[in-house]
Swiss-Prot record:
Gene symbol of the encoding locus: R1B-8
GO biological process: plant-type hypersensitive response
Name by which UniProt lists this protein: Putative late blight resistance protein homolog R1B-8
Natural source organism: Solanum demissum (Wild potato)
Chief place of localization: cytoplasm
CDD domains (UniProt xref): RX-CC_like
Keyword annotations from UniProtKB, A to Z: ATP-binding, Coiled coil, Cytoplasm, Hypersensitive response, Leucine-rich repeat, Membrane, Nucleotide-binding, Plant defense, Repeat
Gene3D superfamilies per UniProt: Helical domain of apoptotic protease-activating factors, P-loop containing nucleotide triphosphate hydrolases, Ribonuclease Inhibitor, Winged helix-like DNA-binding domain superfamily/Winged helix DNA-binding domain
One Gene Ontology cellular component annotation held by this UniProt entry: cytoplasm
UniProt membrane topology term: Peripheral membrane protein
Species classification: Eukaryota, Viridiplantae, Streptophyta, Embryophyta, Tracheophyta
Function statement: Confers resistance to late blight (Phytophthora infestans) races carrying the avirulence gene Avr1. Resistance proteins guard the plant against pathogens that contain an appropriate avirulence protein via an indirect interaction with this avirulence protein. That triggers a defense system including the hypersensitive response, which restricts the pathogen growth.
One of the record's GO molecular function terms: ATP binding
Chain positions recorded as ATP binding sites: 471-478
């Protein structure tokens, strides 16, 4: 048989074509014939082996192996495991090594056996010091047993050739049954071999200092043997070993160090007992395990009890440490939510406990109002009582819990005489959820400074000028600069406005891309392509643009343009030396505003004038700022209240940040003298010297449900703008948001955020133009530093830094959340932090992904975090595989290295948010989503670019629906039928982003019914050519619609408008208008439209009826160079507030100015604003020619550019 295989292999190689040449048809046919012949030979060979082979019949004496070194044995096992893993990854049924799903589970069992056996060999080779012959016998036994593993699998594999079937299921079951039955005592005399080795290991326990059995996988071997071979005997032994297996690897090993030898002894005694039992039971069937225990003199039951007590103690300690100490009320909220989920999930199996669990739930609920009083009272004794509520419950079994809660409640009621002084500062939650902060930041006392800066920005000095502002943290440097940066009288004088924030830790690439994004437009095709170039996605070699190349692109963009650059938080002169070369001086009155805390840096950077030192507020200005923040446009009418307010403002040390924070406290209180006096007394006379004390006071008066939300900001980096949708998603996954009947969690979370904004703890950086909702925010450095430190003190959040020693990490208690910035940090310290509930990666370089060299290590390290609920890797860390064993995950965000999602993703049945990005995904290479995703019924947000379903036929057959799914992006459709099918499966969608290519439909303008709750729809055409949309969009509650790269005409938009009566925002980007570039808007179209944005549309003639757009507030035109004019009917739209024109024709500007004149003079609309962005046509033309030269790299430009 071997000779036959050798000859066949030689013949196949002889016809194998040169890999550098194309296959010839003849060779291809010969190749196919020989493959068929090989399949047939394999099948016949299996039949011969099957007739002769039986696992139990083979004896150790009949197998002689020359090399029985442990290294050789482990290498052979590694080859077996590797080959089996390859087989398990073959998912294409067309391949002849494809393993059907029902057989994979059996092969996984064989894999487990091999891995366990390999560990046993490794452990014995490193620990056993007994005579060599004992180990040689053991290694020989292990090698042959591994070979039997491989043989069973090989006979198990199907072979599809000449219609020959693989082994029948009954035959496979017989082989596996033989294998499973004999694997414990295995090859005779296997039992005596195991007993000899375990006795040898036991004798080395006092000498084994490096690695103990208790902390290693050796504990898996006896428990695995028990699960196969034992029935109900010595259940206590089984419970003990299960406890060790499931928990020891997650517990801090330093807490166990004084018990390791005892635990080793118990584990090895258990193994000796089990294998001795099998050895004797083979001779006497009625032998009991207890008899063997006495015969060996182990007395395992007595030895087990103290170990169990110790392990439970360590488990309790670790679990208590894992609970955050932010607020005691959160303990009960946490326990109540999990108790309800637990009862709902296991309602059938817990029927016998139903009454007890319901009583426990009732008692918990009754504790909440008492604990709220305790949580608000800072007295240490009450705080201890509060924490005891959770820690005492952990120790009790369910029979004792009810009695214990009753006792705790009684203790709390005894302390319910706490003074009511601080109750006035408790937030009125119902009103806070609806509150919205005024959009503009208040500036008081710097009118003279603002005017001076404005004059320097707009003076006639031709050369570049750097205007430096310096001052201590909290003075308002950034607020002041932002006011000028958003002042249209200033901004309109510059061609380009851009900004960046340096801070102490920064990345040149990050700063450059931030500036380029502002300079060329964040949503422009040019910016998107630049990002792809920067991260290497547009290069065959995946070469990233270096910082010098990006700096060159920035210089070319700024050259010959008049620009305004804002550079915030510069710490050293050397930093400015590195940055200044990015900004060319073309003698065109360009300006740079630089902000720093240090006078030396400000003086060093200034060019034509002295740096501006931002002074402190005087007493009168301090009171005015406090009054504005508390009373808004009104004033304080009470002289007594004003006197207290003046005293509080003075106590804040004339620092704007301190005043704003205290105003946040006062704004939530009753405007009574007694309440304000209480605040003044709590602040103390020392407050002006300690900004943290003011923040601490603001934190102290926060309602319990906001404290965790506020401290969670500590997981973000300094000077980073935080995306609100991402933040709210994390809050919800962390269970910070308390559910309220009939209200979406997102709405409640938005109320939480507005509350923090209203207290001046969070700064708004961007609001949605349509509805004013917050889209982005950030924290002041002082507040962020407080969050990081307080979160660490409260066991809430731990930052792992590159210079932190392992000893320091081990000394920490377990924290609820773990944040890190370097992949190596997570790998090195994962063992000491394995009980955390969240792992958050924060990159200093948000545009770039780290190298994927750690992908495999990171993926396996993540499996150590068994209780993980949130895994947020920010698309930065590439993982080798999705950790589908982390069953508690609710939030997963990562970058993957493959274009298919495994079907086992459905194992993450708790998952609510899934954000994945494949490094190679594109319109030509889509991500395949398995049909099992429809089993993930808790999924609420799914974000995977360019994904399509793996098996559309299976999707048709599967009637499951994702009722909770609210956000979906970005499915890729090529047929309208596919889109309809997807929409039927997601009936409650609220936001949908679609990628389509060459959409086909049997009916032109077929009405496609979108989910009734859909509010946001973005539709992108990814075909090279502009295509029509073969369906009308019907979505009765749609508020936001964006269409990009489509061919539209008046008829289509008119018919679609009939189905979109509640549309508020319409954006058309890179759209071709039919009818010779004409768009006719008739009466009744888009009656609720508030924002209309047209970008790079080939619109020449725009005909608008008189009564169209009755509610329009904003009109934005960009790149509409062929448009002749803005229709005159816009003059009579009374709701119009804003028109912006960018890259325009002169006739459009003239019509815009006429509209402005009419709005202001005739209708007295003094709030109307007209913004005209200047454009230099020569530079723009050069830029377009440069863009045209990049088409070979995949850029697709709009036809109006050509």
């Amino acid at each position: 048989m071997i000779e036959f295989w050798r000859s066949e292999y030689t013949r196949i190689l002889s016809i194998c074509p040169d890999p550098g040449k194309k296959y010839r048809n003849k060779n291809v046919r010969m190749w196919s014939l020989y493959l068929e012949r090989v399949r047939e030979v394999i099948w016949k060979t299996k039949q011969e082996f099957k007739a002769e082979y039986s696992f139990p019949k083979t004896s150790l004496a009949a197998n002689k192996v020359d090399d029985v070194s442990p290294k050789f044995v482990m290498e052979v096992m590694d080859v077996f495991v590797e080959n089996l893993n390859v087989l398990m990854k073959i998912n294409d049924p067309c391949l002849w090594l494809f393993v059907p799903g029902h057989m994979k589970e059996q092969i996984e069992q064989v894999l487990k056996e091999l891995k366990l056996l390999r560990f046993f060999v490794c452990f014995v080779s490193s620990k056993c010091i007994e005579p060599q012959y004992r180990r040689t016998t053991f290694y020989t036994h292990a090698l042959i047993e591994a070979s039997h593993n491989a043989m069973v699998v090989w006979l198990h594999l199907p072979v599809y050739g000449n219609k020959n079937q693989d082994l029948a299921p009954t035959e496979v079951s017989r082989l596996l049954s033989d294998f499973m039955e004999m694997k414990i005592k295995s090859i005779q005399p296997g039992n005596s071999i195991y007993i000899d080795v375990l006795q040898a290991l036991k004798s080395t326990i006092p000498q084994a200092q490096q690695k103990h059995a208790a902390e290693s996988g050796i504990v898996e071997i006896p428990i695995h043997s028990l699960t196969v071979g034992l029935s109900d005997q010595m259940a206590n032994l089984q419970e003990m070993i299960c406890l060790l297996r499931d928990n020891l690897i997650h517990l801090p090993i330093l807490d166990l160090e004084f018990h390791l030898q005892d635990m080793d002894s118990v584990i090895l005694d258990a193994g000796l007992l089990i294998y001795s039992f099998y050895d004797i039971k083979g001779e006497k069937e009625d032998t009991m395990l207890e008899d063997i225990n006495r015969a060996l003199g182990f007395d395992l039951p007595r030895n087990i009890e103290p170990i169990k007590a110790m392990v439970y103690l360590v488990m309790q300690k670790a679990f208590q440490c894992n609970l955050p100490r932010v607020h005691g009320l959160g303990y009960v909220d946490f326990l109540l939510k999990n108790l309800k989920d637990f009862q709902g999930r296991y309602s059938d199996s817990l029927a016998f406990l139903k009454n007890q669990l319901q009583v426990i739930q009732t008692e918990f609920e009754s504790l909440q109002p008492f604990l709220k009083v305790v949580a608000e009272e800072p007295h240490n004794k009450l705080k201890t009582l509060n924490e005891d509520c959770a820690t005492q419950i952990i120790r009790k079994s369910y029979e004792d819990i009810i009695e214990e809660i009753t006792c705790i409640k009684a203790k709390i009621q005894e302390k319910n005489t706490v003074e009511d002084t601080m109750k006035t500062v408790i937030a009125r939650t119902s009103s806070q959820l609806a509150r919205t902060l005024r959009m503009n930041e208040e500036i008081v006392g710097f009118e003279d400074v603002i005017e001076k800066l404005r004059n320097r920005l707009l003076n006639r000095t031709k050369g570049q000028d750097v205007i430096s502002i310096h001052g201590m943290p909290g003075l308002g440097k950034t607020t002041l600069a932002n006011r000028l940066y958003s002042d249209m009288s200033v901004v309109s004088q510059f061609d380009i406005c851009a900004r960046c924030c340096v801070s102490q830790v920064y990345s040149y690439k990050d700063l450059l891309l931030s500036l380029i994004r502002d300079a060329i437009g964040e949503n422009s095709d040019q910016h998107r392509e630049l990002i792809r170039d920067a991260i290497g996605e547009n290069s065959d070699q995946h070469r990233e643009l270096c910082a010098n190349e990006l700096a060159d692109k920035l210089r070319k963009t700024l050259l010959r343009r008049r620009y305004l650059i804002l550079v915030d938080d510069v710490w050293e002169n050397s930093v400015w030396d590195d940055l200044r070369g990015w900004f060319p001086d073309a003698n065109n009155r360009s300006r740079i505003i630089l902000m720093t805390r240090h006078h030396e840096v400000a003086k060093y950077a200034s060019v034509h004038g002295d740096p501006l030192h931002l002074r402190m507020l005087d007493e009168d200005e301090s009171w005015k700022l406090l009054e504005k923040k508390v009373f808004g446009e009104q004033s304080c009418s009470s002289p007594l209240l004003k006197n207290v307010g003046l005293r509080i403002a003075k106590m804040c040390g004339q620092l704007p940040l301190s005043i704003v924070l205290v105003a946040g406290i006062l704004s939530e209180m009753e405007k009574e003298v007694e309440c304000w006096e209480q605040v003044a007394n709590n602040l103390g006379s020392h407050i002006h010297n300690d900004s943290r004390a003011i923040v601490d006071q603001s934190y102290h008066v926060l309602p319990c449900h906001l404290k965790s939300c506020f401290l969670y900001f500590g997981a973000f980096l300094e000077d980073r703008v935080i995306d609100i949708s991402r933040l709210i998603g994390l809050w919800i996954s962390e269970s910070f948001i308390k559910s309220c009947e009939g209200r979406r969690l997102e709405y409640i979370a938005e109320g939480y955020l507005e509350n923090l904004i209203g207290r001046n703890l969070v700064m708004v950086t961007q609001r949605a133009i349509s509805d004013g909702k917050v889209k982005a925010c950030r924290l002041h450095d002082v507040l962020l530093d407080f969050c990081k430190k307080r979160a660490a003190e409260e066991n809430f959040l731990l930052w792992i830094n590159r210079d932190q020693s392992t000893k320091a990490v081990y000394s920490h208690k377990q924290h609820a959340h773990l944040a890190f910035t370097e992949m190596d940090n997570l790998v090195e310290w994962s063992a000491s932090c394995s009980l955390v509930g969240s792992v958050l990666f924060k990159s200093y370089d948000p545009y770039f992904r780290p190298l994927s060299s750690h992908a495999f290590a990171i993926s396996h390290i993540l499996l150590n975090f068994k209780f993980l609920k949130v895994l947020d890797l920010e698309h930065q860390v590439i993982i080798d595989f999705i950790p589908t064993e982390l069953f508690y995950l609710r939030y997963l965000s990562a970058h993957i290295d493959q274009n298919s999602i495994p079907s086992s993703i459905s194992n993450l049945w708790n998952l609510e948010t899934l954000i994945l990005k494949s490094r190679s995904a594109s319109k030509h290479n889509r991500v395949l989503l398995p049909s099992t995703v429809w089993d993930m019924v808790k999924l609420r947000h799914l974000h995977i670019p360019y994904f399509s379903t793996e098996d559309e036929e299976a999707l048709l057959e599967n009637s499951a629906k994702l009722y909770d799914l609210e956000t979906l992006s970005s499915p890729y459709f090529s047929r309208v039928e596919d889109a309809e099918l997807m929409l039927r499966r997601t009936p409650n969608l609220r936001k949908l982003i679609c990628e389509v290519q060459c959409l086909e439909s049997p009916h032109q303008y077929h009405v496609l019914n979108f989910p009734i709750r859909l509010e946001i729809l973005k539709l992108y055409n990814r075909s090279k050519a502009f295509k029509t949309i073969p369906f009308c969009i019907s979505a009765p509650n749609l508020k936001y619609l964006k269409l990009s790269r489509f061919y539209l005409d008046s008829q289509y938009l008119s018919e679609t408008a009939d189905h979109l009566k509640h549309l508020e925002v319409l954006k058309l980007s890179c759209v071709e208008f039919g009818d010779h570039g004409e768009w006719e808007v008739s009466n009744g179209m888009f009656p609720q439209l508030k924002i209309l944005k047209l970008e790079y549309v080939s619109l020449m003639k725009w005909i608008v009826a008189d009564d169209v757009f009755p509610n329009l507030e904003q009109l934005v035109l960009r790149g509409c160079r062929h448009l002749m004019e803005i229709p005159s009917c816009f003059m009579d739209i009374l709701s119009l507030k804003y028109i912006k024109v960018d890259e325009y024709s002169e006739s459009v500007v003239q019509s815009a100015r006429k509209i402005q004149e009419t709005q202001i003079e005739e209708y007295q609309n003094n709030n109307f604003k007209l913004v005209i962005i200047k454009v230099h046509y020569r530079e723009k033309l050069n830029e377009l020619f440069s863009l045209l030269s990049l088409t070979v790299l995949g850029l697709v430009l709009h036809p109006i550019f050509l």
